[in-house]
Regions:
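Active-site region of the double-stranded beta-helix
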Residues: 1-113, 133-183
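Histidine-centered metal-chelating micro-motifs
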Residues: 116-129
Length: 183
């Protein structure tokens, strides 16, 4: 199989990694995920969104809050539907992508990559997603680092981009089916 390279990258903010086409036949696309870009896989998350789903959802008066994982890199592949993904980092600002199984577009609709690809953002990058009217399904290949705690990994934040500040508005474990902590 041909060697795959990173298509686009802003270090510490995001990467676009093409999938490796293995076979194209009538009605079938078969692609490989380039594992060379994953130091390891600590979790594989299957995420299904219904029509127009918003993640994270509103918290109190904050209609569009953000997730931020301090100890997890996300490696997102959209399998069906459309995901409008916004990412933000204090040093890099905000960037938006529309991710489908066949391509990635910039937030303004300009084609960024024509083909199946993985959108990657590292730990400490804020992110939020809205699914299209058809809903969406994805796989996320999570890479965990020391300090990863499932009780705080999905904390939800409000951002003040102008001031470069953020604060916790909902503890992530409150929305999860986690076992009770070990005493």
């Amino acid at each position: 199989m041909a060697e795959v390279e990173i298509f686009q990258e802003v270090a510490g903010f995001y990467r676009l990694i093409p999938l490796q086409p293995l076979r194209r036949t009538a009605g079938v696309w078969f692609d490989n995920i380039p594992l060379a870009f994953l130091p390891r896989i600590d979790a594989i998350d299957r995420v299904i969104h219904r029509t127009g789903a918003v993640s994270p959802g509103p918290v109190g008066a904050v209609s569009r809050p953000w997730y931020m994982h301090p100890h997890q890199d996300d490696n997102l592949i959209v399998l069906s539907g459309r995901r409008d993904v916004e990412i933000y980092h204090l040093e890099h600002g905000r960037r938006s992508f529309t991710v489908t199984p066949e391509q990635i577009r910039d937030g303004d609709g300009a084609l960024v990559y024509d083909g199946p690809a993985m959108l990657v953002w590292p730990r400490e990058v804020f992110h939020r997603i809205v699914s299209g009217p058809e809903g969406s399904a994805s796989l996320n290949f999570a890479v965990h680092y020391p300090g990863m705690d499932p009780r705080t990994n999905f904390n939800i934040y409000e951002l003040d981009e102008a001031a470069g500040k953020y604060w916790l508005i909902r503890e992530g474990f409150r929305d999860q089916n986690l076992p009770p902590p070990v005493a």
